[in-house]
Amino acid sequence: MVLTQSTAQAKYWNNPDGWKQTVEYLNSLGYEVVCIDKNSSYGIEGNMNYMPEGCVDKTGDLPLEDRINDLFHCEFFIGLGSGLSWLAWACGKPVIMISGFSADYAEFSSPYRVINKDVCNSCWNDISCKFDSSNWMWCPREKSFECSKKISFEMVKEKIDQCIKTI
């Protein structure tokens, strides 16, 4: 189960091929990848984010109970720093969280957290960075979202493989 959409571009996995490679990899392992985002595409004109090809589309504005039921049936969850990742964690599912904008201490503890600390990261928790909710493209340090762009598929694959070994 995957969640690829969020409420600000800084929260996305901005690696242009990341989700495509991840879904292809999971499909090659025999997994049916189900996308449970609210929307199949989201963003602003000129910067839209789309559900990856190869996913089963269960997007929609569904009740929380339906999402809990979806999560109950998944082996593990891959998502962003968002509410559904927290919900999956609360449901006891292993969560592979892809997030560069938030600090480790600001999210639930997970052995499968994916962050690249070799580049700009954790602006969300830096009190000198003032979040501008009216600016979809908010990147306070003007690094073009390198915090998540520089999270490679290989980094995510490593966490997927670790997770699969434990379930």
Regions found by a protein language model. Give the residues of each.
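Bulky hydrophobic/aromatic packing residues
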Residues: T4-Q5, D37, F77, S152-M155, ...
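Donor-binding and catalytic core of enzymes assembling or modifying cell-surface/extracellular glycoconjugates
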Residues: W13-A103
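Residue-level detector of conserved, well-ordered beta-strand and adjacent loop positions
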Residues: L3, T59, I115-N116
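Conserved donor-binding/catalytic core segment of Leloir-type glycosyltransferases
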Residues: M1-A10
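Nucleotide-sugar donor-binding patch of glycosyltransferase catalytic domains
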Residues: Y50, W89-T166
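A generic structural signal for short coil/turn motifs at secondary-structure boundaries
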Residues: Q9-W13, E146-C147
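A short, mixed-charge helix-start or loop-turn motif at secondary-structure junctions
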Residues: Q5, V56, R141-E142
